[in-house]
A protein has these predicted regions:
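Glycine-rich phosphate/pyrophosphate-binding beta-alpha loops
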Residues: 224
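A conserved pocket-lining segment of Rossmann-fold NAD(P)-dependent short-chain dehydrogenase/reductase
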Residues: 99-100, 165-180, 204-218, 228-253, ...
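N-terminal Rossmann-like NAD(P)+-binding domain of SDR-like oxidoreductases, especially those catalyzing
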Residues: 1-210
Length: 264
């Protein structure tokens, strides 16, 4: 038996990963305590997804655990034992605004929670791949220094710039920029994941995603803008655009495409 531990398993990427790797023959140990409801209110609750996973996936087991609780996490890792073959860490506090209001909670979930998972992986399954859903917010406001051209309907990177064709890559610095407290806690987690890979020779990887979307997203005004926009359109609720003359450009990535990249 192959076991995959997936945190944030009822969220957008975690649920997609749970279904995908279950279809590949993994038994999935899903960890999610619906903290998204605490962050954003009842409309953001992921309980509906948890119930759907438990109903539709034969080999899915759910653990309602806070990833800041190292002892509770340890019990899950020990139960998985030598069958633990993969860790996908999707759980996070994802809001800039919420992080500013509760920085200790934000850092505890994003940084300390990640450290707990890395250390348990090192202790119990050091050969298992550890996939971390980081964020493009690790770059802070550095992208704002790119040569931007204002067009009639959008801002666009100058076509002569190397990032124009394929977007920003890891050559962009994460230093000397304004990150928000959320971005800073994710930087800490991102660097920890890299360091465990290099220092302990573990198989770790960071995916610095942004504007991820899909049918499993419990979108709210503060997070999950495309899902929230669709919800507003369906319910005929006004949708508010903040700043930049409404010319922001976002390249949305479907959750299935990201999880397929995990597999590749």
């Amino acid at each position: 038996m192959k076991i995959a531990i997936i945190t944030g398993s009822a969220g957008l990427i975690g649920a997609e990963a749970s279904r995908f790797f279950h279809s590949k023959g993994y038994t999935v140990f899903g960890i999610d305590n619906d903290m998204r409801k605490e962050f954003f209110g009842d409309e953001a609750s992921t309980r509906w997804m948890r119930l759907d996973l438990e109903k539709s996936l034969k080999n899915y087991r759910h653990f309602e655990i806070d990833i800041r609780d190292a002892a509770a996490l340890g019990n899950v890792f020990r139960e998985a034992g030598s069958d633990l073959a993969l860790i996908i860490h999707c759980a996070s506090q994802p809001s800039h605004d919420w992080a500013a209001k509760a920085p200790h909670v934000d850092f505890g979930v994003n940084a300390t929670g990640t450290l707990n998972l890395l250390e348990l992986t090192r202790q119990t399954a050091p050969a298992a791949p550890f996939i971390f859903t980081s964020t493009n917010k690790v770059y802070g406001d550095t992208p704002n220094r790119l040569p931007l051209v204002e067009k009639e309907t959008r801002w666009e990177v100058d076509t002569a710039h190397p990032f124009f064709k394929h977007g920003i890559d890891e050559s962009m610095s994460i230093d000397q920029s304004l990150h928000s407290l959320f971005g800073a806690s994710k930087v800490a987690a991102d660097v920890l994941v890299q360091e465990y890979g290099r220092y302990f020779q573990m198989k770790t990887v960071c995916f610095r995603g942004g504007c991820l979307t899909g049918p499993g997203h419990s979108g709210t005004q503060l997070h999950g803008f495309l899902a929230y926009l669709m919800k507003c359109a369906i319910t005929k609720t006004p949708y508010k655009v903040f700043g930049y003359k409404g010319k922001q450009v976002r390249d949305n990535i479907h959750s299935h495409d990201l999880v397929e990249a995990f597999w590749q």
